[in-house]
């Protein structure tokens, strides 16, 4: 039996899933959380899926009354970020959380977040939700005032 243990993130997991299916190879991802990761019957994941993470984050914010006005900054070119954002937005409505801005960036435009941050500020955001990786998150935090 051939086995692929990996990939670590969603985008490469989705990219190789059809190849492992064609090769009749068992694929296990420890942290590929996009729903598309397990679209083929040969692929399994160990972690929570993006829908679970987005829903749980909105529930936590709502149940603990952390904010009623939330801005979202996400990477629309990444299945992980987009998947979490979609489910967070849906559950936020159920929790009575107003999304005051939902601003995207892409992998080729991920250095200057002044526009997204200004829209969050103008919308009166009490919390900014960042379903993204640490590189961009650190830039956003450094640019926020």
Predicted regions and their residues:
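An alpha-beta-alpha
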Residues: 43-106, 126-127
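Short, conserved catalytic or adaptor-binding loops enriched in Gly and charged residues
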Residues: 35-38, 93
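Extracellular/periplasmic bilobed ligand-binding domains
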Residues: 20-23, 84-145
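Beta-alpha junction/loop-to-helix N-cap segments that form part of ligand/metal-binding clefts
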Residues: 1-36, 105-107, 111-113, 138
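Ligand-binding "clamshell"
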Residues: 23, 39-44
């Amino acid at each position: 039996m051939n086995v692929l243990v990996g990939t670590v993130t969603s985008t490469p997991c989705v990219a190789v899933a059809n190849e492992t299916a064609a090769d009749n190879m068992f694929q296990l991802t420890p942290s590929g959380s996009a729903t598309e990761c397990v679209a083929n019957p040969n692929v399994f994941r160990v972690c929570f899926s993006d829908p679970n993470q987005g829903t749980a984050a909105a529930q936590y914010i709502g149940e603990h009354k952390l904010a009623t006005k939330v801005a979202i900054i996400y990477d629309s070119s990444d299945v992980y970020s987009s998947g979490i954002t979609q489910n967070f937005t849906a559950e936020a409505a159920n929790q009575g959380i107003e999304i005051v801005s939902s601003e995207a960036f892409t992998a080729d435009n991920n250095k200057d977040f002044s526009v997204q941050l200004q829209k969050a500020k103008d919308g009166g955001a009490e919390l900014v939700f960042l379903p993204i990786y640490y590189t961009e998150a650190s830039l956003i935090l450094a640019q926020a005032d």
